[in-house]
């Protein structure tokens, strides 16, 4: 232990390394550049393969993991209802036809749709289900065959019956 003028300088000395390490390493510092690559004293003639990477728990983030592992058989669309303060998402691939979809929407938002006729639209209800297709046009749910609807639907909106005829 080095003591100078009664001071213990060894304890307050700043050095690189882990705390409590007693080994002192001599570092070579030079300002001379060489064209040679650094020499690795630890390497042997035979280079060992790098160790296998282990996956850290919680990595990758859940969001990107969900995107990568996303099931390709789903088709989520946003559903809004006039007067409801929130939006929902539903998977159109879960339903096989319009009656199943409308029943699910009725249960989700607690309303009734009524009967659909091609000439008059939806009768007997204060609400009309509409959807936005890939072209950005708003159409009545049930106007096109189910397969075409499920592939082109971008958003669903349950409009008040009084607003639907003027908007479409």
Curated annotation (Swiss-Prot):
Region feature Disordered, mapped onto this chain: 1-74
Taxonomic placement: Eukaryota, Viridiplantae, Streptophyta, Embryophyta, Tracheophyta
Gene: IAA1
Gene Ontology cellular component terms for the protein in this record: nucleus
Protein name: Auxin-responsive protein IAA1
Induction: By auxin.
UniProt GO MF annotations: DNA-binding transcription factor activity; identical protein binding; transcription cis-regulatory region binding
Tissues expressing the protein: Preferentially expressed in stems, leaves and flowers.
Organism in which the protein naturally occurs: Arabidopsis thaliana
PTM field: Phosphorylated by phytochrome A in vitro.
Gene Ontology biological process terms, A to Z: auxin-activated signaling pathway; response to auxin
Keywords of this entry: Auxin signaling pathway, Nucleus, Phosphoprotein, Repressor, Transcription, Transcription regulation
Domain PB1: 74-161
């Amino acid at each position: 232990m080095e003591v100078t003028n009664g001071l213990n300088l060894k304890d307050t000395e700043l050095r690189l390394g882990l705390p409590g390490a007693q080994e002192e390493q001599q570092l070579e510092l030079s300002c001379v550049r060489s064209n040679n690559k650094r020499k690795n004293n630890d390497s042997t003639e035979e280079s060992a393969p790098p160790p296998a990477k282990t996956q850290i728990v919680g990595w990758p983030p859940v969001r990107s993991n969900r995107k990568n592992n996303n099931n390709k058989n789903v088709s989520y669309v946003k559903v809004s209802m006039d007067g409801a303060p929130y939006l929902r998402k539903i998977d159109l691939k879960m339903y096989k036809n319009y009656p199943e979809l409308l029943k699910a929407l009725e249960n989700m938002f607690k309303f009734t749709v009524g009967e659909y006729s091609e000439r008059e639209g939806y009768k007997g209800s204060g609400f009309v289900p509409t959807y936005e297709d890939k072209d950005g046009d708003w159409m009545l749910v049930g106007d096109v065959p189910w397969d075409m609807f499920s592939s082109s639907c971008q958003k669903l909106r349950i409009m008040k019956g009084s607003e639907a005829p003027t908007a479409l």
